[in-house]
Every structure is written in structure tokens, then in C-alpha cells.
Amino acid sequence: MIASNTSSLPLPRLAEALVEPERFLGLHWFNPAHLIPLVEVVPIERTDPSVVEWSMALLADLGKRPLALSRPVAGFLANRLQYALIREALQLVDDGVATPEQIDSVMTDCLGLRWAVLGPMQSTDLAGVPPAVAVARELFPGLSNADAPQPVLSELLESGRLGVSTGEGFFAYPDPEAVAQTRDRLLSSVLGILAEAKG
């Protein structure tokens, strides 16, 4: 079996160089890989189903939660959802509607907490389909459909503010190593609480 962790390069194109493409698929882990349970399993059209089954079993044995996609799509599932939200967040910052701090607060103090318990689809079921349809009709036409990075992101790139690695992005990071350490510590705590609550 040959697997790629990429979610940005087209898997069918990578498989063109292989003698046995039926043994190839994507196994997309998420950072930090030792903590995030989900791993996307992405077969191409020629992937043998037994390779998918073997990969799913291996990941489960490693304590992961494998999720098999039916076919490759650019970015796979998690990054498509993540970047749909990031695109809207960048637009709100670029339009002066919200600050980066406010965007992150909405996620860490509201949506992230709710979605850690119930995903967006089950949250929709809980709220009810009729209100979801009404809100979608109202909001969808005004959501960002930008097909290129918003200026606020391009300006960070051009100014050399590349994020934690350079000590500054949307925020300043006087101690870059502490950012990942804090993230890992808090993620471990959240995962422990969720595991205990689910029994």
C-alpha cells in the first residue's frame, strides 16, 4: 500500500506514476497528529476496496477515527469545511465587520464548543430544518464567494508576517513555542473531557 498525506495535490495525478495504482490512496492526518483523532481515507477510482478496508482497520488499531471519502475532492472534507469558514472570516475582517480577535472568540467561545459536541448537521437537526432553510435563504446570497485570497491575507504575506513561525501574523507571538504547547495541552484536556462525558 502507498499512501499520501497531501490534501492539496490531486491524488489521481500522483497515481499516474505508479505501477500498481490500485494500492494507492490518501491518508490525511491533521496537526497535531498525535492528538487529533480523525484521519481522512481517500481512495482514487482505481484503489482496490481491500486497501481501503486494511487502512481503516490499521487506523482504528492505532486509536484513530478513520473517515473514508467516496472519492477525492480538492482539499478533501475537513479542509473544504475549514476553508469555507476561513474564507468568510477573512472577508469579515477585510470588510471591517470584525477583528481577528472577535473572529477567534466566536469560534473558541461559541461555535467550536458547540461543534465539539454536535456537528453542524446534527446542530441543524436540533434547531430544526425550517429555521435552517429560512436563515440560509437570508444569509447565503451575502456570504463570500471569493475565489482568491482576500487582501488582508495577502498583506500579511507581503509584509513577512507569516504566522507563528515568524513571530507575527494576525497576532504577535513573543514565544512561538508556547503556542503549540498551549494548543496541545488544551486539546488533550478537551479530548479527555469529551471521552469521559461520552463514557
PLM regions and their residue ranges:
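AAA+ ATPase "lid" subdomain C-terminal helix
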Residues: Y83, V93-D95
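Structural/interface elements that position substrates and couple domains in central-metabolism enzymes
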Residues: A78, Q82-E88
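NAD(P)-dependent Rossmann-like dehydrogenase/reductase catalytic/cofactor-binding core
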Residues: K64-L67, D95, P100-G199
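Rossmann-fold dinucleotide-binding core
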Residues: S4-R80
